[in-house]
């Protein structure tokens, strides 16, 4: 259990947590008949007796309640995931039909476009993660669903009119909701499906894997639908309008979950840190929130900071490759026509189809077998083979796409399944996922824009079109080569400093948690000033770099032969 005192709190100073001391606390009393009775207030961060409750989650929840949660929560990212998957498929058409200041856009501008939804998420998740912890995920998710729907509308209008700036504006609006709503999902899953000493081993790994798998289904739809729809209607942008319709459906499901949660008894509801402060003035809310934000940041364990610092730019390397895969197949193995685009899109669908089945199995495997650290190196090796075969050989694209699908299956699940183990307090879960999302968004922005710029540079240096991806591939392969070595690094860290939590099965973890009580798994599973400062400084630097790269390539006119690079 993490220390309640921040490493930055001065002796005798008042901790920001004291600003949020609840007027009443959740308690469990035994009545004369031996039944369990809960108070009317949900668990709130503040007292020592609350700590166990905020780590347990929805104790005694029925499977009917859990099924309702799953069916409404899984679809919250429907519209966003579909649209993000459709953009890479439509890259050849985007380059031919989208204008900036009267010029067709180039590959660097396309990189700006695909990373626009990430731009706001270089900063927003730091705060939205705390917002999810402070106010609960349901209403935050409803706001995010609204942003996604409006963003999809603006993006579709921009595509219809061929306006680069309008498409970017829609992407940014969609980005405001996309990452934050996923944090809301993860917070909800951790509350309802995390194992405890009361209910026994949970199914968090399985549910997390199933969430990732259903996201792959939405991505599969985004990969398969746009090309046939374009062929049937003669309009390349109709696939994006379908994403707007899906986002409206997701918004309606989010509203259903909010209404469902209001019917639950207080002990079933997710812990909120400011439940009793709803009547504060706006300024008091701001100052209290900033205090809570800082308190959450400094209580994040060192192991979590180490995890995201080591993985810096790795997600961006994958995003840079994936956003260009369809165009890479067309350029290196096909012709510049709708038939080649349609064929490439079908092959690209393997990227989503295979993980639909395998991802839940991987998540369940982590619950039953452990060894999340080993999956990181295996994932990197799959990507190295996929990228090398796709970019530097003429083998049938199905072969590299098969390796790509296996890599994509393992890409995020080990980290999503590990974060709740390193960050044991429920009221810090949103903050931790927010920091992780912000780091990933910054890395994706930098790497996607850099990848597009390297493609344009290759063309300007006289490389033939079929070799325009060489420079970008050299960059991303370097990062994946490093990641292949990280499994051994994580094994050593986990064994010595993390208490073996990455290698444990869910059953072993619950048993050890019962033995440790409030003690930490390992020496780095609690806050350390050095790692907190290093993480915060790195956050500022990578966010500044992301904004600098993005703005520079947004306002720069396309070079030489726009749209043909």
Residues covered by each model-derived region:
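Conserved MFS/SLC helix-loop-helix module at the cytosolic interface between two early adjacent transmembrane helices
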Residues: 123-164
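Extracytoplasmic gate region of multi-pass secondary transporters
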Residues: 87-88, 301-360, 447-448, 543-552
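C-terminal transmembrane helical hairpin of 12-TM major facilitator-type secondary transporters
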Residues: 370-415
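Symmetry-related core transmembrane helices of the 12-TM Major Facilitator Superfamily/SLC fold
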Residues: 238-256, 470-490, 534-544
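Extracytoplasmic
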Residues: 68-100, 321-326, 416
């Amino acid at each position: 259990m993490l220390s309640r005192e921040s490493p930055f709190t001065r002796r005798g100073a008042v901790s920001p947590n004291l600003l949020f001391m609840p007027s009443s606390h959740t308690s469990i009393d035994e009545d004369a008949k031996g039944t369990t009775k809960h108070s009317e207030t949900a668990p709130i961060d503040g007292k020592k007796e609350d700590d166990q409750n905020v780590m347990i989650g929805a104790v005694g929840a029925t499977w009917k309640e859990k099924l309702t949660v799953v069916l409404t929560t899984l679809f919250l990212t429907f519209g966003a995931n579909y649209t993000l998957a459709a953009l890479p498929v439509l890259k050849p058409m985007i380059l031919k039909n989208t204008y900036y200041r009267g010029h067709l856009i180039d590959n660097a501008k396309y990189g700006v476009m695909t990373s626009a939804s990430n731009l706001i998420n270089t900063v927003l998740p730091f705060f939205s993660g705390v917002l999810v912890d402070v106010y609960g995920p349901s209403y935050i998710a409803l706001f995010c669903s609204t942003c996604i729907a409006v963003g999809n509308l603006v993006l579709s209008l921009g595509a219809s009119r061929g306006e680069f700036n309008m498409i970017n504006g829609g992407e940014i609006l969609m980005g405001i909701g996309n990452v934050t709503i996923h944090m809301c999902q993860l917070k909800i899953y951790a509350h309802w499906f995390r194992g405890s000493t009361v209910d026994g081993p949970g199914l968090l790994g399985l549910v997390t894997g199933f969430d990732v798998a259903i996201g792959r289904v939405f991505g599969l739809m985004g990969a398969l639908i746009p090309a046939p729809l374009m062929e049937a209607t003669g309009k390349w942008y109709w696939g994006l309008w379908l994403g707007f319709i899906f986002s409206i459906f997701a918004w309606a499901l989010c509203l259903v979950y909010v209404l469902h949660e209001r019917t639950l008894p207080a002990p079933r509801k997710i812990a909120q840190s400011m439940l009793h402060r709803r009547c504060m003035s706006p300024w008091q809310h701001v100052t209290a929130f900033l205090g809570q934000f800082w308190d959450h940041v400094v209580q994040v364990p060192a192991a979590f900071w180490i995890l995201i610092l080591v993985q810096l730019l790795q997600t961006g390397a994958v995003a840079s490759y994936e956003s260009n895969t369809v165009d890479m197949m067309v350029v290196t193995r096909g012709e510049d026509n709708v038939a080649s685009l349609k064929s490439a899109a079908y092959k690209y669908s393997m990227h989503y189809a295979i993980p639909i089945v395998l991802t839940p199995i991987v998540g369940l495997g982590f619950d039953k077998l452990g060894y999340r650290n080993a999956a990181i190196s295996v994932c990197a090796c799959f990507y190295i083979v996929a990228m090398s075969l796709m970019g530097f050989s003429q083998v049938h694209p199905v072969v590299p796409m098969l390796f790509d699908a296996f890599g994509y299956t393992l890409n995020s699940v080990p980290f999503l399944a590990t974060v709740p183990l390193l960050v044991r307090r429920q009221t810090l879960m949103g903050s931790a996922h927010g920091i992780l999302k912000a780091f990933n968004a910054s890395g994706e922005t930098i790497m996607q824009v850099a990848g597009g710029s390297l493609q344009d540079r290759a063309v300007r240096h006289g490389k033939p079109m079929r070799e325009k991806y060489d420079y970008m591939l050299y960059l991303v392969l370097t990062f994946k080569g490093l990641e292949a070595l990280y499994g051994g690094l994580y094994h050593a860290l986990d064994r010595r400093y993390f208490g073996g939590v990455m290698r444990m099965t869910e059953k072993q973890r619950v048993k050890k948690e019962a033995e440790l009580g409030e003690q930490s798994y390992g020496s780095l599973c609690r806050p350390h000033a050095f790692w907190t400062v290093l993480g915060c400084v790195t956050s500022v630097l990578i966010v500044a770099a992301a904004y600098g790269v993005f703005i520079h390539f947004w306002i720069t006119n396309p070079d030489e032969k726009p749209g043909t690079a």
